[in-house]
Amino acid sequence: MEKHLLVAVGDEYASSLSLRYVYGFFSRRDDVKLTLFYVSPKTPSHAAAATGQGQDPPRCRVGDAAALPALEKAKSWLLDMGFPKANVFTKTCRSDQGVVKDIIKECEAGLYDAAVLGRRGLSWFDEMFTDSVSHKILWEAVGFPIWVCRNPDQNRKDVLVCLDGSPQCLRVADHAGFILAGEPAHDITLLNIRAEDSADPGPVFAKAKEILAENGVAPGRVRTRTVTSPNPSQAILKLAKTENYAAVAIGRTGDRPQALMEHIVGSTSLKLLRKLEGAALWLCK
């Protein structure tokens, strides 16, 4: 089944990390649609329009690659790398609510299968952890997967899907299955980090395998692994590095905004977000 990803593009070189990751990850590029999305800052004319002093131009435009060197350069690079021209789209949007909120708004409106952010995307995430309102937007209102790419290594393979039995982690398995069903370059490892007295992870693995099979992933492409550790994030980071995984997929929670800071600080997903390099972090709620 065809996948459609939103790839955030910025002016600086670092934003190319998301492009490099997408190129390196997919071997069947005919099955992937990419929308390159650029959020431009507000200009004086936009501000005047917002206050009724001018005509408000369209907030988002499709196909404006020629108007923005960053978009045109990104699109040309992807075409040179083998992505079909018919599968690569460009879209510009003047900032309305701030870059992060504008990306969220576009992803929800466009029904993308994931949003892909590079290093600049990581800095946007860091900003979100300093503001309670932004916390709420990221950890509650975002209903689509987010891929964060920090120094991606194109020689890495396979996806490490972290499971703890929560609904969020089962949705991670569903997302990984959808992305990888028609992508033979990568297999899946289901990982359970457990304490000494934890319950048998067998039922969790069985449910995840069932979800993967429903997505069309052959059983032979799925492995399971159990690690006993009191520090889940450290164990995941070590495994991702030693086994050279291309992606680490993990669920994220945030169902109670009043307890958000207590939940997020020190969470496994936050530690991975800040420390994982070489592999992309796939976050699903």
Briefly describe each language-model feature range:
Residues 1, 76-115, 216-258:
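Structural beta-alpha unit
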Residues 1-57, 154-223, 245, 275:
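Small/aliphatic-rich secondary-structure junction motif
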Residues 4, 27-28, 101-153, 242-285:
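Gly/Ser-rich helix-loop-strand patches that form or flank binding pockets
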Residues 15, 96, 169, 229-230, ...:
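A conditional alpha-helix N-cap/helix-loop micro-motif detector
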Residues 22, 74, 103, 137, ...:
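Aromatic/hydrophobic pocket-lining residues that form π-stacking "cages" and hydrophobic walls in ligand
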Residues 35-37, 89-93, 147, 189-191, ...:
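General small-molecule cofactor/ligand-binding pocket signal
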Residues 55-69:
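A short acidic, glycine-rich active-site loop
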Residues 94, 121-124, 194-198:
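Short histidine/acidic/glycine/proline-rich micro-motifs that form metal-
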